[in-house]
């Protein structure tokens, strides 16, 4: 089973993805952007002003996403899919070339056969993580709109997730996965020292990753 959480930056995708991965024992594919940025030994500030560099960066991020998914043989949860192409449209001049490629068409069909959750933005989730484009409400809305356009253009069925409540997001994911016959791992006890440690760990992860 392939499960995707798509949406703009600062919508809580990674937080929910991490929970689903742990709860259902699914391999987690997290965003390729940070890894590619580190490999290129580049900074986000450099990407802002170097068009060739940012074009290479976005092309590599998309290629890496496709390659890593194939390595997992179609069994994973990912905190994004084609999302970076919205950023390519926002910051580069190669978006048309990327979207005209056979690989893009094949990938969108591949995504359409998975479970797609579309996490919508909310001002309360804005947080600057020092990696992605300036975390402004206007930027978030532009990326959100482009991702929705691509979902609709390619007839990809998706579940919109409007709530910012982690509990409600978890319930939405659990409902869909249960209807798909995916069983969760047994829950850890919440009483006792181990239970408190697990609760503290989850709370800490939620607070640190909420903006992803």
Regions found by a protein language model. Give the residues of each.
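Hydrophobic anchor at the beta1->P-loop junction of P-loop NTPases
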Residues: 5
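A glycine- and Lys/Arg-enriched "phosphate-lid" helix/loop adjacent to the NTP-binding pocket
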Residues: 93-165, 170, 190
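Glycine-rich phosphate-binding loop used to anchor ATP phosphates in small-molecule kinases
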Residues: 56-111, 126
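Conserved lysine of the Walker
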Residues: 13
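Pre-Walker A (Motif I) flank of P-loop NTPase domains
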Residues: 1-2
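Conserved substrate/cofactor phosphate-moiety recognition/catalytic segment
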Residues: 18, 22-66
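The conserved Walker
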Residues: 9
């Amino acid at each position: 089973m392939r499960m995707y959480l798509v949406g703009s930056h600062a919508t809580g995708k990674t937080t929910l993805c991490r929970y689903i991965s742990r709860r259902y024992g699914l391999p987690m594919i997290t965003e390729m952007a940070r890894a590619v940025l580190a490999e290129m030994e580049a900074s986000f500030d450099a990407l802002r002003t170097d068009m060739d560099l940012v074009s290479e960066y976005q092309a590599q991020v998309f290629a890496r996403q496709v390659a890593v998914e194939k390595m997992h043989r179609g069994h994973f949860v990912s905190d994004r899919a084609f999302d970076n192409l919205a950023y390519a449209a926002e910051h580069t001049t190669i978006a048309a070339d990327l979207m005209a490629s056979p690989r893009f068409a094949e990938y969108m069909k591949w995504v359409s056969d998975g479970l797609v959750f579309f996490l919508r933005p909310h001002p309360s989730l804005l947080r600057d993580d020092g990696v992605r484009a300036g975390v402004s409400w206007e930027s978030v809305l532009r990326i959100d709109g482009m991702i929705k356009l691509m979902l609709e253009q390619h007839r990809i069925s998706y579940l919109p997730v409007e709530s910012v409540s982690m509990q409600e997001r978890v319930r939405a994911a659990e409902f869909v996965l249960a209807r798909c016959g995916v069983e969760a791992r047994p829950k850890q006890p919440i009483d006792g020292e181990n239970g408190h440690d697990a609760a503290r760990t989850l709370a800490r992860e939620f607070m640190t990753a909420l903006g992803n």
